[in-house]
From Swiss-Prot:
SUPFAM superfamilies: ACT-like (SSF55021), HD-domain/PDEase-like (SSF109604), Nucleotidyltransferase (SSF81301), TGS-like (SSF81271)
Catalytic activity: GTP + ATP = guanosine 3'-diphosphate 5'-triphosphate + AMP
Cell compartments where the protein resides: Plastid, Chloroplast
Residues covered by the ACT domain: 809-880
Residue ranges occupied by any HD domain in the UniProt entry: 184-291
Organism of derivation: Oryza sativa subsp. japonica (Rice)
Transit peptide boundaries: 1-52
Single GO term (MF): kinase activity
Name of the encoding gene: RSH1
Function noted in UniProt: May be involved in a rapid plant ppGpp (guanosine 3'-diphosphate 5'-diphosphate)-mediated response to pathogens and other stresses.
Protein name: Putative GTP diphosphokinase RSH1, chloroplastic
Cited InterPro entries: ACT-like_dom_sf (IPR045865), Beta-grasp_dom_sf (IPR012675), HD/PDEase_dom (IPR003607), HD_domain (IPR006674), NT_sf (IPR043519), RelA_SpoT (IPR007685), TGS (IPR004095), TGS-like (IPR012676)
Domain TGS: 574-637
Length: 892
C-alpha cells in the first residue's frame, strides 16, 4: 500500500505518521483505507508532541463516500472499486456552532465536533488514498461528477462553460503529477471547488480550472482561452500566469537573488489584481489548496511558504472581507510556523471550552429564551439563530502576544453569534430596518447581562473598509464568575454572508458585472436563491485600497525597487490598521502608529505638501501626532510660506512619517523645494540636509554656542545667514547680521514720515537704505496675508527721532486659535523682550492668523525669543527684521 496523502517516506525531513485508519472498506474490496483525518502538518513528528501527541481522530466522526474514480459525492453511495476518499473535517476552532430551538447544536470536543445534529459543515478537507493505482480511473467525467454539486447554483449554460474548461484543463495537465504523486488535475479542480463554495461566478471557476494551463503546458494559449471562454476568463488567467511565470523566468537569471525574484513576483500580483479583482480571489483559492497539501514540501519550504501566506495572502483575504479563507490560511500558517505554540494553545483552548461548556450552553439557552419571547423580533424577523463560536486560534495567539500574556493566562475563547433573518419591511415601518433590528437585539443582550465598559464595537454604523458589518459587545454572563467574559456578535443573514465571502459576494452567481454595479442592481445570489446587492458605494469601499496600489506604482515607478514596493504594501496596507474619520464622516484607515503627516498624504499629495497644522477632535495638534481609532482629523493648509521654510518643516516631518508612501512623497517634495532654493538633495542625504540661502557661504559666521544649545543653535545660524541689502549698493557692501550690534534710528517717535537711518558698527546709512532679514517662514509681508497691504492707515506708523533706542520687528504666522497672542507675548517677555506694540489680523476662511510685533531687545534675546516662539503649538512661521526707507518704517 502506498503512503496516504499526508504521509511520506520516513526518511524524508518532513516524514509523517498516519494517526488513524478509516475502517470503511470499499465496495467489492476488503481492505480498509488508511488516512489522516487531521491536516497533514499535524502528523509531522515535530508536531506530535505535547497536546498533539494524542490527537488521534476517530473516522466515525468523518463523513465520506466515494464517487466515480475515487472522488466523493455527498449523499450518494459508493459505486465502484475506487480508492480515493474525501474526508470531511469540521474543525471546532472555526466552525463550531449551535442554535436554540430548532437550530443545530454542535460543541467542539477534542479535535472535532460531537454533533447533536446530522449536519456538519464541510469546510476544510483532507484527501487520502490507498494506492496510486486509483488515479488511473480518474477521467474528466468523474471529476465533473464530483465538482458539479459544489457549483450547482450556476445556470445550465454556465455549467456547460465550466465543464468545457474542466475538459481542457484535464487535457492540458494529462500525465502531470504533483509532489505528492497525485495527478496534477486534482489541484485545479480543488481550486474550482473552493471558488464554488464561495459561490463565485462561472468565469472565476473556469479561470480556476485553467489558471496553470498556459504556464505549465504548450497546448493552451491566451488566445484559445479568449476564443472559447471570453475575454474575462483570459484576463484572470493572464493575471495569474504573469505572476507565476515571471518568477520562474527570473530565477534563471543568476544575477537576481531569490528575494528579488519573489518581490517582483508579488509586485506583479499586486498590479494584476488592480486591473481585475478576481485575479487575487483565484490566487487565494490556489494558495489555500497549496497550504492544505503543504506537507509534501521540504520543511524549510513549508516555513517559507507559511510565512509568506501569513504576511501577504491572509491579510489580502482580510482586506477583501473573505474571512473564511483568511481564517484557514492563518490557522494552517500558524500550525507550520510555530507548531509548539500551536499545540499548546490548541490544548489550552480545548480545556477552556470544556471547562465552560456548561456555562456556554446555559448562556445560549437564556439568550434564546429571551429572543423567543420578544414580540418585536417575532414581528420583524423570520428566524433568529444563536451560534456558539470558538475564537480563531491565531487571533487568540496575536492577542496574547500583544498583551504579553502567556498561553496559560488566556481566558476568553468563546463567542455567541446572533444571526437574524429579517422579514420584508413592507407596511411595518422604519423600525424594521436591518440595522434597527440589530440594535434592538443589542439592547436585549445588555438587558440580560452586564456589558463591559468600552467593549461595544459598532461596525454597522461604521463598517470596516472591507465591508464587514456587525455589532460586538463583551458581557459578564455570570456574576459569580467574573473572569468568564463572553463576546456576543449581532448581525443579519446578509451581513453574515458578506462577512464570510466579502468581495466574492459581488461576483456571486449569474448576475455579476465586470465593473461596479449600479445602485440597486443585483450582483448575484446565494445558494438559497436570495439576491445579494452591492451598490457602487459598497463596492468602492471594498476595493479602495487597490487604487492606492495603482497610484503608488504610477507615482513611484523607477524610484522604488520591487522589494520596497512589496514592503510598502505589506506594511502600509496589510499590517495592523487604525481607523479615523474625515470632517465629513468618511472613514480612512492607516497603519497602526501612523501620524497626521501620513493622513494628510493619504488624502492627497498636495494636502500633505501644503499642510501646516491639524485639528484632532477639534483640538489643535502637531502634524507628528500619532493617530488613534475613531479620531476626527482636519488638516489645515497654507501655501504662502517660503520654499525654504516649507523645506525645513517637511524635513522634520520625514522621520515621523510611518508609511513608506508618505516618506516617498515628502522626499519628492523636498527635492522640488531644494531646487527652488538652488540646493541639491538626494534621498540618501535627506535626513542630514540643511537648506541654506543661495549665497549663504558668503555671509555665514560662526556663532558661540549658547546656554540652550539644542534649541537656539539653528536660530543663530538662520539669523547669521541672512543678508543686508542697501538700496543701489553693490553686493560687496552687504554685511552679515552678526556684525549688527543693534539697529538704531535717529530721532524720536513721531507720527510723520521722516528720512531714517541705521548705525552699523558706527557707520550710518540713510536715504534709500533697506535692511531685510525676513526668515525663516515668510519671504515678504505680502505673502503672509494678502490683505496686509490694505491694513488701516492707523495701523501704520513711522518712527524717527528715537536715537539710542533699538527697533526690531517680529512677524508670526500661526493657526488661529484662542490664547495664541497671549502665549507669544509671554514667550517674548520671558526672553527679556520689551513689546512696544502689537497688531494681529486673521483669515477666518483659512483659519490662519498674522501677528506683527514691534519690540526692543538685544540680539541675544532675539535668538532666544525666536526659539521660544517656534516651540509654541500652532506657530507656522516667523520673521524678524528692521526697515529704514524714505517712505517710512512699516510697523504695527
Amino acid at each position: 500500500m502506498q503512503p496516504p496523502t499526508g504521509a511520506v517516506s520516513g526518511s524524508s525531513s518532513s516524514s509523517l505518521e498516519c494517526v488513524s485508519s478509516c475502517r470503511t472498506s470499499w465496495r467489492g474490496g476488503g481492505r480498509p483505507y488508511e488516512c489522516s483525518v487531521l491536516s497533514c502538518a499535524w502528523n509531522a513528528p515535530r508536531a506530535l508532541t505535547g497536546a498533539l501527541a494524542s490527537t488521534t481522530a476517530q473516522c466515525s466522526s468523518c463523513s465520506h463516500a466515494e464517487a466515480g474514480a475515487g472522488w466523493r459525492r455527498r449523499g450518494q453511495s459508493q459505486r465502484s472499486n475506487n480508492s480515493l476518499l474525501h474526508i470531511t473535517w469540521a474543525e471546532g476552532i472555526n466552525r463550531g456552532k449551535f442554535g436554540y430551538g430548532s437550530s443545530a447544536h454542535s460543541f467542539p470536543t477534542g479535535n472535532f465536533f460531537k454533533s447533536w445534529s446530522t449536519s456538519v459543515d464541510p469546510t476544510w478537507r483532507v484527501f487520502c488514498y490507498s494506492s496510486s493505482e486509483s488515479f488511473n480511473h480518474i477521467s474528466p467525467e468523474t471529476l465533473w461528477e464530483d465538482l458539479k454539486p459544489a457549483i450547482s447554483y450556476l445556470q445550465p449554460e454556465e455549467l456547460n462553460f465550466v465543464h468545457d474548461a474542466l475538459k481542457l484543463a484535464y487535457e492540458a495537465h494529462n500525465g502531470q503529477k504533483r509532489r505528492s504523486g497525485e495527478p496534477f488535475i486534482i489541484h485545479p479542480v480543488e481550486v474550482a471547488r473552493i471558488l464554488g463554495e464561495h459561490e463565485l461566478d462561472w468565469e472565476s471557476i473556469a479561470a480556476g480550472l485553467l489558471h496553470d494551463t498556459v504556464e505549465d503546458t504548450d497546448m493552451v494559449t491566451f488566445e484559445r482561452i479568449e476564443n472559447e471562454f471570453g475575454v474575462t476568463v483570459r484576463r484572470i488567467v493572464e493575471g495569474e500566469t504573469k505572476v507565476s511565470k515571471l518568477g520562474k523566468l527570473q530565477c534563471k537569471n543568476e544575477g537576481n537573488s531569490k528575494q528579488d525574484v519573489k518581490a517582483e513576483d508579488l509586485r506583479q500580483m499586486f498590479l494584476a489584481m488592480t486591473e481585475e479583482v478576481r485575479v487575487i480571489i483565484v490566487k487565494l483559492a490556489d494558495r489555500l489548496h497549496n497550504m492544505r497539501t503543504l506537507t509534501h514540501m521540504p520543511q524549510h519550504k513549508q516555513y517559507a511558504i507559511a510565512m509568506e501566506t501569513l504576511q501577504v495572502f491572509a491579510p489580502l483575504a482580510k482586506l477583501l472581507g473573505m474571512y473564511r479563507i483568511k481564517s484557514e490560511l492563518e490557522y494552517l500558517s500558524f500550525m507550520y510556523m510555530n507548531p509548539g505554540d500551536f499545540a499548546e494553545l490548541k490544548k489550552r483552548v480545548e480545556d477552556l471550552y470544556k471547562a465552560h461548556e456548561q456555562e456556554l450552553e446555559e448562556a445560549n439557552q437564556i439568550l434564546g429564551e429571551k429572543i423567543a419571547e420578544d414580540q418585536f423580533l417575532d414581528l420583524v424577523s423570520v428566524e433568529t439563530q444563536v451560534r456558539s463560536v470558538c475564537k480563531e486560534l491565531y487571533s487568540i495567539y496575536k492577542t496574547a502576544l500583544k498583551s504579553k500574556s502567556s498561553i496559560n493566562e488566556i481566558n476568553q475563547v468563546a463567542q455567541l453569534r446572533i444571526i437574524i433573518k429579517p422579514k420584508s419591511c413592507n407596511g411595518v415601518g422604519p423600525l424594521c430596518t436591518a440595522q434597527q433590528i440589530c440594535y434592538h437585539v443589542l439592547g436585549l443582550v445588555h438587558g440580560i447581562w452586564t456589558p463591559i465598559p468600552q467593549a461595544v464595537k459598532d461596525y454597522i454604523a461604521t463598517p470596516k473598509p472591507n465591508g464587514y458589518q456587525s455589532l460586538h459587545t463583551t458581557v459578564i454572563p455570570f456574576l459569580n464568575e467574573s473572569m468568564f467574559h463572553l463576546e456576543v456578535q449581532i448581525r443579519t443573514e446578509d451581513m453574515d454572508l458578506i462577512a464570510e465571502r466579502g468581495i466574492a459576494a459581488h461576483y456571486s452567481g449569474r448576475g455579476v458585472v465586470s465593473g461596479p454595479v449600479r445602485p440597486g442592481i443585483s450582483s448575484g445570489r446565494n445558494s438559497n436563491g436570495k439576491v445579494i446587492c452591492l451598490n457602487n458605494t459598497g463596492f468602492a469601499l471594498r476595493i479602495g485600497w487597490l487604487n492606492a496600489i495603482r497610484e503608488w506604482q504610477e507615482e513611484f515607478v523607477g524610484n522604488m525597487s520591487s522589494r520596497e514596493f512589496v514592503d510598502t504594501i505589506t506594511r502600509d496596507l496589510l499590517g495592523s490598521r487604525v481607523f479615523v474619520f474625515t470632517p465629513k464622516g468618511e472613514i480612512k484607515n492607516l497603519p497602526k502608529g501612523a501620524t497626521v503627516v501620513d493622513y494628510a498624504y493619504l488624502i492627497h499629495t498636495e494636502i500633505g505638501n501644503k499642510m501646516v497644522a491639524a485639528k484632532v477632535n477639534g483640538n489643535l495638534v502637531s502634524p507628528i501626532h500619532v493617530l488613534a481609532n475613531a479620531e476626527v482629523v482636519e488638516i489645515i493648509i497654507y501655501d504662502k510660506l517660503s520654499a525654504k521654510y516649507a523645506f525645513q518643516r517637511h524635513q522634520q516631518w520625514l522621520q515621523h512619517a510611518k508609511t513608506r508612501s508618505a516618506r516617498h512623497k515628502i522626499m519628492k517634495f523636498l527635492r522640488e523645494q531644494a531646487a527652488l532654493s538652488a540646493a541639491e538633495i538626494t534621498a540618501d542625504a535627506v535626513n542630514n540636509f540643511v537648506a541654506d540661502l543661495e549665497d549663504e557661504s558668503d555671509y555665514e559666521q560662526s556663532i558661540p554656542s549658547s546656554e540652550n544649545k539644542d534649541y537656539t543653535f539653528n536660530w543663530q545660524k538662520i539669523l547669521n545667514s541672512d543678508k543686508l541689502s542697501f538700496g543701489n549698493k553693490k553686493s560687496d557692501c552687504f554685511l552679515p547680521v552678526k556684525n549688527v550690534s543693534v539697529p538704531k534710528v535717529n530721532g524720536k517717535h513721531n507720527k510723520t514720515v521722516k528720512e531714517l537711518g541705521i548705525k552699523i558698527n558706527g557707520s550710518t546709512f540713510r536715504g534709500d537704505s533697506f535692511t531685510d532679514f525676513i526668515h525663516p517662514g515668510v519671504s515678504s509681508s505680502k505673502e503672509v496675508l494678502p490683505s496686509v497691504d490694505n491694513w488701516k492707515a492707523g495701523k501704520i506708523c513711522a518712527w524717527h527721532n528715537t536715537e539710542g533706542s533699538s527697533i526690531q520687528w517680529l512677524c508670526i504666522v500661526c493657526v488661529d486659535r484662542k490664547g495664541m497672542v497671549a502665549e507669544v507675548s509671554s514667550a517674548l517677555t520671558a526672553c527679556g523682550i520689551t513689546i512696544c506694540s502689537c497688531v494681529a489680523e486673521r483669515d477666518k476662511r483659512r483659519g490662519i492668523g498674522v501677528m506683527l510685533f514691534h519690540f526692543e531687545g538685544a540680539y541675544e534675546n532675539v535668538v532666544s525669543a525666536c526659539s521660544g516662539v517656534d516651540m509654541i503649538l500652532g506657530v507656522l512661521g516667523w520673521s524678524v527684521g528692521c526697515s529704514c526707507n524714505p517712505l517710512g518704517v512699516l510697523e504695527c
